Amino acid sequence: MFDQTTQPEAHQLTVGKIETANGTIKPQLLRDAVKRAVTNFFAQMDGQEAEEVYEMVLCEVEAPLLDIIMQHTRGNQTRAANMLGINRGTLRKKLKKYGMN
């Protein structure tokens, strides 16, 4: 699903490839996809005040991330926590939050 670009100085997640106006194919960065999604969200709000945008975006990204990591580690929470760089207790709380326990 996600690829990492081959730039050694910065491992950036990509969500696919896009063709530029001049026909060049380049990676589509996850960061850019999130930026577009949030921009579209605000456009749809039509001037209304938005609340809890941080939590909304975090949930949209965090839940599939946890799901993929748990699949990759075959449910091993210690390995998953190490891969994510978080405490195992924190991982357990997040899994419970998204109903993945």
Swiss-Prot record:
<dbReference type="GO" id="GO:0043565">
    <property type="term" value="F:sequence-specific DNA binding"/>
</dbReference>
<comment type="subunit">
    <text>Homodimer.</text>
</comment>
<dbReference type="InterPro" id="IPR009057">
    <property type="entry name" value="Homeodomain-like_sf"/>
</dbReference>
<keyword id="KW-0238">DNA-binding</keyword>
<dbReference type="InterPro" id="IPR050207">
    <property type="entry name" value="Trans_regulatory_Fis"/>
</dbReference>
<comment type="similarity">
    <text>Belongs to the transcriptional regulatory Fis family.</text>
</comment>
<keyword id="KW-0804">Transcription</keyword>
<feature type="DNA-binding region" description="H-T-H motif">
    <location>
        <begin position="77"/>
        <end position="96"/>
    </location>
</feature>
<keyword id="KW-0805">Transcription regulation</keyword>
<dbReference type="GO" id="GO:0003700">
    <property type="term" value="F:DNA-binding transcription factor activity"/>
</dbReference>
<dbReference type="InterPro" id="IPR002197">
    <property type="entry name" value="HTH_Fis"/>
</dbReference>
<protein>
    <recommendedName>
        <fullName>DNA-binding protein Fis</fullName>
    </recommendedName>
</protein>
<dbReference type="InterPro" id="IPR005412">
    <property type="entry name" value="Fis_DNA-bd"/>
</dbReference>
<keyword id="KW-0010">Activator</keyword>
<dbReference type="Pfam" id="PF02954">
    <property type="entry name" value="HTH_8"/>
</dbReference>
<comment type="function">
    <text>Activates ribosomal RNA transcription. Plays a direct role in upstream activation of rRNA promoters.</text>
</comment>
